[in-house]
Amino acid sequence: MSSEKDKKNSCSKFSLSVVAAILASMSGLSNCSDLYAVGSSADHPAYLIPQAGLLLDHIKDIFIGPKDSQDKGQYKLIIGEAGSFQDSNAETLPQKVEHSTLFSVTTPIIVQGIDQQDQVSSQGLVCNFSGDHSEEIFERESFLGIAFLGNGSKDGITLTDIKSSLSGAALYSSDDLIFERIKGDIELSSCSSLERGGACSAQSILIHDCQGLTVKHCAAGVNVEGVSASDHLGFGGGAFSTTSSLSGEKSLYMPAGDIVVATCDGPVCFEGNSAQLANGGAIAASGKVLFVANEKKISFTDNQALSGGAISASSSISFQNCAELVFKSNLAKGVKDKCSLGGGALASLESVVLKDNLGITYEKNQSYSEGGAIFGKDCEIFENRGPVVFRDNTAALGGGAILAQQTVAICGNKSGISFEGSKSSFGGAIACGNFSSENNSSALGSIDISNNLGDISFLRTLCTTSDLGQTDYQGGGALFAENISLSENAGAITFKDNIVKTFASNGKMLGGGAILASGNVLISKNSGEISFVGNARAPQAIPTRSSDELSFGAQLTQTTSGCSGGGALFGKEVAIVQNATVVFEQNRLQCGEQETHGGGGAVYGMESASIIGNSFVRFGNNYAVGNQISGGALLSKKVRLAENTRVDFSRNIATFCGGAVQVSDGSCELINNGYVLFRDNRGQTFGGAISCLKGDVIISGNKDRVEFRDNIVTRPYFEENEEKVETADINSDKQEAEERSLLENIEQSFITATNQTFFLEEEKLPSEAFISAEELSKRRECAGGAIFAKRVYITDNKEPILFSHNFSDVYGGAIFTGSLQETDKQDVVTPEVVISGNDGDVIFSGNAAKHDKHLPDTGGGAICTQNLTISQNNGNVLFLNNFACSGGAVRIEDHGEVLLEAFGGDIIFNGNSSFRAQGSDAIYFAGKDSRIKALNATEGHAIVFQDALVFENIEERKSSGLLVINSQENEGYTGSVRFLGSESKVPQWIHVQQGGLELLHGAILCSYGVKQDPRAKIVLSAGSKLKILDSEQENNAEIGDLEDSVNSEKTPSLWIGKNAQAKVPLVDIHTISIDLASFSSKAQETPEEAPQVIVPKGSCVHSGELSLELVNTTGKGYENHALLKNDTQVSLMSFKEENDGSLEDLSKLSVSDLRIKVSTPDIVEETYGHMGDWSEATIQDGALVINWHPTGYKLDPQKAGSLVFNALWEEEAVLSTLKNARIAHNLTIQRMEFDYSTNAWGLAFSSFRELSSEKLVSVDGYRGSYIGASAGIDTQLMEDFVLGISTASFFGKMHSQNFDAEISRHGFVGSVYTGFLAGAWFFKGQYSLGETHNDMTTRYGVLGESNATWKSRGVLADALVEYRSLVGPARPKFYALHFNPYVEVSYASAKFPSFVEQGGEARAFEETSLTNITVPFGMKFELSFTKGQFSETNSLGIGCAWEMYRKVEGRSVELLEAGFDWEGSPIDLPKQELRVALENNTEWSSYFSTALGVTAFCGGFSSMDNKLGYEANAGMRLIF
């Protein structure tokens, strides 16, 4: 038996002989049906006949060459000379086939098993050696090279296991190689060459209009080493290779060096091909590679080379208008330092173009250099019709999926685009730039993703720095370039779970878990949601290296100067503009200990970040962790959030500044947005929500609410966790668990800090070890629970601004302005907070700054600043329930000023407290030179201090100047400055120029002096004190102005000076208003203390004229039941002087010596309440008193209770409406016609009535309305006799005609009814019983409101007789007209039980009933139409009702607080009523009927009366 080696040699020799015969007889044989060559078979003869023919005209349609060459002659057959090349020497080979050869393929060509690699010059099964072409040949010939032209459905070419030593083991042409219309498959497999083109090599290759192409396991052995850079990617080709140098770079048919696969209608497959030492595992071209208009799947699988694992080209690579493209598991194994460019699938020195394809997939391609799937100068993916997928591609350096040196454009695609699971050192999915290894320099390009219709996603990409060599840029988990644009895309754009692991280095930019751009990032005009979720940048441990490398690593660590940032996005300038929805969620930035610059858990814009015009923006659950790492969500030099419909920053965390936003240099602007929310953000040092270290925070022009809630800045300690972050492995499950644990620990540390008790007494605080000065300095650097800035402007917002439950460890629970670092305090900018021009309320509620006994000089529960200005606001400004060590609401630092103006709303301080004040504390003035500049309020508005004003170091202060209340510079300042219930010590002279200064609820106001101008008013309540402090301070210029005003005023007043020579008054008051509402005469209460004026010991009275007027600040007037119900003595005023803390009667002023005029409130005709007399003022025990003696009570009509009694009328009205509906629709002639039948029916009803009269205003009318539904069943027990039952439910409302009172009503009604027809007489009767639940609210304005609930019941019994008179023929056929007079008797009764109201001005009502008997009468016109089973009756009724009997029982009402009772009554309705009714009853068949009815009514015959209303109903019935 022969050996395998012998068989192989035999096969080879036989195959060569067949090939020799073919080539030798090409011009001599006359017939050819099959070309077949195989090793041991002699049954397949070889025939070949040259056939003249033309290439199809449409070949020219895809002509790639110069346009002017398309018109050069016709394609004709050129037959080469006969010869046998295998017997010739290599030197003579080019002369054997000198011209082109055209093969007509009509049956399959199969050749396999030819191995010529042991022959040094073996080249090609079919060869063309044309040599250099003269111009004469080019002018004469239209085609040069080898062409296979199919001519039938069975044609095909199979070339298998062919090997040669030179290029093109199967086919070689120094000119073109063309496959045209081969409708059987073209299969080239296991072909190999020791040079280029394992299967085919030519000057250019065209495969056109063929059935399919399969190229497998071909290999090229050429070595690319030493090839110039310009020819580098065209050198190789495991299967196909083209080079433009074979024929002097000339080609008649297509450009030299190009490979084109066009309009093939079968699959194209390149699998397992390789060029181990060169480029282009499947294809290498010195020109272009073009796949165009192919109809079936094109796949490149498991190919490998140094660069371009599947395809490499010196020019462009294009796939256009093809079906599905698949590139899978291709490998570019060359490394960067060996001059390999990369491109796991494709590598081009020009553009890679993917256009108008039905689907594209790049999966598990790998590059040991750059571009895991694609490498090129430019990459264009546009107008594809199917999905584009890059999955699990890997690059050792940049561009896990794509690396382009200049631009990447992904535009106009119609379906989805996804990049998943890619890995690289930078640019996990796409990197754009020329990353030269020389001097670590990089020239970055741009990425444009725009106008795509489908969703775009970048998922689970990973960047892991593989070496310390690339230090300029590290990051870009998904995208990396100089400029990146995502614009005008219609689908959703998602960046999720992309991660960057980088070394801490002295590089310029480190980070960008999803996007890294050295220039601009523009995300604009996208219609779908844009989401960045779960992206991260984390430090990577420096790998184990040699001692020299370790030394370099240590040096690198020490010289870190780059910026680390952007858990999701890092760019120089970031603009997110006019998108639909933008979400940054759960992105994170983790930095090692040596990285001390940067931040931005989600976004880092080095120069600016602009988020403008988006519909919805959310930054949630992002965090930035590391040493001095700021901006839990966003970091930039300047930030602008403008014109967004909704903005939400929630649960972001930073371990240095700016829990949500950090602005490092410029300003942070929140301008012209809709709803803005900053909630649950956490910062460690400055700014729980926003930190703006060197600029301003501007909140202006927003059109919806702006809320800062539950933000915290505190100092947690978690050094152990930071160490874990630095050394963890990003790929391990353990790392993910540690990251989650880290975030949980950070959050818990914030929670623990904020949960500490605020109000512990100093001695009850736990003991602590000695705190060093350095530690105290660190503790002090914590401020701005919501905002930290140089200045804060809250202006011109349209809706409320809310700061709620924000917390700071030290300063400013909500807002801090200024600096805590000495280097920044030299700034000439004065820290200030300005709240101005807002239309909505501005509210600070529940904010807090923690008390630390080691830092007593801290605070500002809501605001800590130097200057505070609140002015020109149309809404209220409220400080409610804030807390701090000092300044429960506001802390003003030394040299600061406060200017408050209540313009279109009030300014209120209520419930604020501090540890230092041990209670109430509105504003704390620190240092010796802080002060209040002015307090102004416009008419109807007030500045209200329910908490104290506290000044530090009162005794040591220099003169704090003049405090002006309601400056006369604006005549509109006539409102009030009101102190309630607390003691405020203001070390300033107070000048009340106009408007009012009010001390209520026992308030104490201490100052250096008080002056009242003629237009000003001072109001004191019981127990309040106006106290003058003893001051040695010198008068400043402002006090001199006060002295000038004193000298110019001539109004008589109580003028008290420090001594007889004083020119500036301690007290200069002409009128004091005493608040009557503050006094009470209840026996169980202690008598109220008289208001006091207290001056220092030794004060001198210069004049003693004073007017006292009794006023009521609550507006109750004589409705003050507690004071005026009984005889009362009111202490009006007393004057004291303070001597060593004790109070004595003013020694130089006796009340009896005062010329005091007392005026009491007038009692006029419109005055309601307690009536009585005031006595003359008298002196008792050194106090001025006045007595009140009541004589009666005058009832306000709004308390009369008419609406309660009128509800009885409404109770009867519901019963009457149901009665009328049953008479109109259930007790009719139509119903009586169905003897012994049963009807089930349903009815909807409604009514409206307005009852009023000029004569009845004193009793009060009402408007009532209700709707309801009723259902019932009736039957005929005998002929012409019907009996039925029904039930109904309803709800409605009653409104008082004249006052603010209403009743909501709902109830049920049950009824029985009957009818009997006796000839022309129709008798009808019914009985109804109802129950109604009533809820009443009465509002009295300043007197409060009352509420009551009760149930009322009603009964109605009715009997009616109707005489039916026929008009017209005695026996009508279709139409009948009846005239029916009727008379009716109706009895109705309604009542309610006794009940008592709750609330202010509560009343007690006695049980009351209303009974009446009414006799309605009138006439009804009926027109009936009958045809078959159809019957319709329309009627018009006109009637009048006369009330014959009316009785009201009960009616007693008592005003409980006043102790006054009276007899109430319902409205005295007119006893006549006119009604007009329109009704329709239609029987559609013997089983179904419908009903409609409308009734209008009015009451009385006098124009003075007014009783109007309507009733409407609609229903149906089923007849059984």
From Swiss-Prot:
SMART domains: Autotransporter (SM00869). This is Probable outer membrane protein PmpD. Residues 1233-1520 form the Autotransporter domain. Coiled coil: none annotated. It is a peripheral membrane protein. InterPro entries: Autotransporte_beta, Autotransporte_beta_dom_sf, Polymorphic_membr_middle, POMP_repeat. Keywords: Cell outer membrane, Cell wall, Membrane, Secreted, Signal, Transmembrane, Transmembrane beta strand. It comes from Chlamydia muridarum (strain MoPn / Nigg). Belongs to the PMP outer membrane protein family. The gene is pmpD. NCBIfam families: POMP_repeat. It is found in: Secreted, Cell wall; Cell outer membrane.
